[in-house]
């Protein structure tokens, strides 16, 4: 039996306080307004009989005489095959004009997957982006962010990864998006040809903060059902996790919580970890691979959001000057696939290329300071130009095997075989034959 409460004692921001009994944290409530409209709210805290709820869609138009009905369940999202190809908002309602989604309601904010049923990641996710495939491999079930400054093309990178991987289903969770960003996701998914296997959960910048917080939970709840029930390999793309953290901060401030670092709530680490830990490779089942975008205000890597994220995830891609910076990027799972599911020369070649490129940066610094350059410095600078053009540029779109072959060609065009520090048996097998004795 549902109990109706009519005594709203306080309205502040997107929060209301009502005198009620028996409410649970996270419980969903329906607010019936005196004008006949209704909206939903979620329980954030309670103190004796005073229950504080966050109202979806804001409190504009609410009055203290509105009726509050506690539904006895937490927030749910519709799950089913009809979800594929659809776009929904932060409360799970369609926004694409295609009518209602049909399926079974499933709870969000569920616990992470049972560790006993997880398996060690073993498969590579190929993206056709050399700076990922060659140097920091993306592994199935990996959780990894893209650290990006404002103005970088991180959304374009996300869409390219979505289009070029072999994931069965792509789920995009957009948080704090402008209309331009939202339109870009819709148009690019159609242009790149994966709209028919894509689900989008969209929170726009003008929507309520609580809807922003729900976006990752909805996306990951659906991803887990697809992976468990249908053995699907699901790629989840979340952008922007800084907007997610800002929504948490706004809610915490409204609730008069004591802030921690730079105003963010003290629970920021656990709030982020709860979402990232949903990435999983399921024994005899599907998988969830999670890539997020975390923008760094002021290009500050020590900002609380990227700083906490780095302790949770299995590496990061550092997007800088519209390139994936090899020195700021890391994949902690790449050793599980390099040389095991890729070519035998992969590891040695990648290490040699990065080492020589690091040396070229030192040579470029010496040149900028007016030092006389040695012949070796000149070789390094010539190598760096080829490396940046043929491998580092995000415009390069080639399979892993071709990228490895290009890496060998770049080395052969710039150095003698004995100068690159690669094992002789690999030199004899992969060094371009026309340059074998250089």
From Swiss-Prot:
Record has Phosphoprotein as a keyword: no
Example GO molecular function: ATP binding
InterPro entries (UniProt xref): ATP-synt_VA_C (IPR055190), ATPase_F1/V1/A1_a/bsu_N (IPR004100), ATPase_F1/V1/A1_a/bsu_nucl-bd (IPR000194), P-loop_NTPase (IPR027417), V-ATPase_su_B/beta (IPR022879)
Pfam families assigned to the protein according to its UniProt record, in alphabetical order: ATP-synt_ab (PF00006), ATP-synt_ab_N (PF02874), ATP-synt_VA_C (PF22919)
Alphabetized CDD domains for the sequence: ATP-synt_V_A-type_beta_N, V_A-ATPase_B
Gene3D superfamilies for the chain: 3.40.50.12240
Keywords: ATP synthesis, Hydrogen ion transport, Ion transport, Transport
SUPFAM superfamilies: P-loop containing nucleoside triphosphate hydrolases
A biological-process GO annotation: proton motive force-driven plasma membrane ATP synthesis
Keyword Transport annotated: yes
Annotated transmembrane regions: none
Family to which this protein belongs: Belongs to the ATPase alpha/beta chains family.
Function: Produces ATP from ADP in the presence of a proton gradient across the membrane. The V-type beta chain is a regulatory subunit.
Protein name per Swiss-Prot or TrEMBL: V-type ATP synthase beta chain
Naturally occurring in which organism (per UniProt): Chlamydia caviae (strain ATCC VR-813 / DSM 19441 / 03DC25 / GPIC)
């Amino acid at each position: 039996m549902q109990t109706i409460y009519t005594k709203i004692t306080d309205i502040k921001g997107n929060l209301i306080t009502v005198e009620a009994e028996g409410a649970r944290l996270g419980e969903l409530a329906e607010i019936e307004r005196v004008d006949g409209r209704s909206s939903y709210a979620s329980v954030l805290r309670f103190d004796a009989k005073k229950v504080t709820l966050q109202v979806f869609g804001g409190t504009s138009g609410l009055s203290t005489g509105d009726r509050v009905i506690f539904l006895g369940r937490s927030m749910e999202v519709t799950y089913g095959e009809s979800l594929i190809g659809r776009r929904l908002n932060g409360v799970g309602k369609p926004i694409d004009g295609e009518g209602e989604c049909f399926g079974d309601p499933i709870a969000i904010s569920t616990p992470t997957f049972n560790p006993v049923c997880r398996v060690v990641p073993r498969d590579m996710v190929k993206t056709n982006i050399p700076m990922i495939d060659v140097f920091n491999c993306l592994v199935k079930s990996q959780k990894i962010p893209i650290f990006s400054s404002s103005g970088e093309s991180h959304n374009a990178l996300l869409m390219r990864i979505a289009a070029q991987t072999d994931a069965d289903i792509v789920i995009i969770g957009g948080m704090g998006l402008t209309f331009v960003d939202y339109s870009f996701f819709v148009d690019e998914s159609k242009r790149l040809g994966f709209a028919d296997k894509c689900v989008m959960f969209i929170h726009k910048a003008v929507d309520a903060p609580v809807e922003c917080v729900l976006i990752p939970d909805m996306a990951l709840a659906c991803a887990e059902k697809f992976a468990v029930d249908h053995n699907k390999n699901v790629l989840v793309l979340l952008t922007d996790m800084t907007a997610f953290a800002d929504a948490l901060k706004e809610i915490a401030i409204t609730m008069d919580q004591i802030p921690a670092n730079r105003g963010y709530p003290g629970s920021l680490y656990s709030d982020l970890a709860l979402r990232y830990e949903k990435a999983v490779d399921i024994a005899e089942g599907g998988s969830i691979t999670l890539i997020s975008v975390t923008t760094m205000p002021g290009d500050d890597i020590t900002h609380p959001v990227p700083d906490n994220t780095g302790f949770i995830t299995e590496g990061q891609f550092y997007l800088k000057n519209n390139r994936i910076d090899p020195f700021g990027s890391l994949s902690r799972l790449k050793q599980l696939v390099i040389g095991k599911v890729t070519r035998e020369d992969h590891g040695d070649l990648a290490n040699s290329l990065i080492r020589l490129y690091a040396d070229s940066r030192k040579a470029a610094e010496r040149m900028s300071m007016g030092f006389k350059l040695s012949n070796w410095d000149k070789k390094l600078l010539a190598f760096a130009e080829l490396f940046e053009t043929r491998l580092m540029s995000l415009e390069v779109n080639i399979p892993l095997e071709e990228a490895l072959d290009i890496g060998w060609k770049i080395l052969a065009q710039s150095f003698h075989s004995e100068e690159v520090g690669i094992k002789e048996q690999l030199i004899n097998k992969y060094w371009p034959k026309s340059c074998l004795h250089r």
